[in-house]
């Protein structure tokens, strides 16, 4: 059963800053592969980001958490790989 995908306010703000081509790829990925298999398409992060996963879309990354109890993927941030881990 596919997971429900939700974007935080910060992630929505990040989406508005993306180039149109990247935005389309991120949205397609989020509601496609990510919603179907969130554990397979991302990798778990460590240290201060433990419990968070990172998935690639070209040179951009999506940071997300998985709520298995409610079958929901919550996308926390979307940004270029050089900037996403800095905040």
UniProtKB/Swiss-Prot annotation:
- UniProt keyword Nuclease, yes or no: yes
Name a biological process GO annotation: mRNA catabolic process
Q: Does the keyword Repressor apply?
A: yes
Highest taxon of source: Bacteria
One Pfam family, short name: ParE_toxin
Q: Give the multimer and partner information.
A: Interacts with cognate antitoxin RelF, which neutralizes the toxin. Also interacts with non-cognate antitoxin RelB in vitro, in M.smegmatis this neutralizes the toxicity of this toxin.
Provide the family line.
Answer: Belongs to the RelE toxin family.
Q: Which PANTHER family match?
A: TOXIN RELE
- Protein function: Toxic component of a type II toxin-antitoxin (TA) system. Has RNase activity and preferentially cleaves at the 3'-end of purine ribonucleotides. Overexpression in M.tuberculosis or M.smegmatis inhibits colony formation in a bacteriostatic rather than bacteriocidal fashion. Its toxic effect is neutralized by coexpression with cognate antitoxin RelB2 (shown only for M.smegmatis). Overexpression also increases the number of gentamicin-tolerant and levofloxacin-tolerant persister cells.
What protein name does the entry list?
Toxin RelG
Source species: Mycobacterium tuberculosis (strain ATCC 25618 / H37Rv)
Q: Which gene encodes it?
A: relG
